[in-house]
Amino acid sequence: MIKSFKEGLSGSLARFYLDGKRSKDIPVTIESSLKRKLDIIESATTERSLFSPPGNNYERLSGSLEGWSSIRVNIQWRLIFQWRDGAAYDIYLD
C-alpha cells in the first residue's frame, strides 16, 4: 500500500497516479510501466510480495540510501521508497 509520496499529494508522481495527470517530469515512454509498478506497490501487503515478478528488480538500497528500497520501472528509472509496517512511504521517481 502506498501511504505517502515524497513530494506530497501535489507532486507530479502523486498527480499522475491518483488523478491520471501527465507531467513533463514523467516521460511518456514510461507511463504505462510506471502505472503498473505503482499498482504493484499499492497492492503489496508484505515486502516479500515486491520480489515477484522478477522484473520488478526489487532491492534494498545501501550507502546514502540505506533504509530505502526500489523497484525498477525500466533500465533508467526506478521508484524509491521506504517500506515500513506493510506500506510504502515517501515514494518518488528517480
What are these model-derived regions, one by one?
Residues 77-79:
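Histidine-centered metal-chelating micro-motifs
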Residues 1-73, 84-94:
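Basic, Lys/Arg-enriched alpha-helical interface segments
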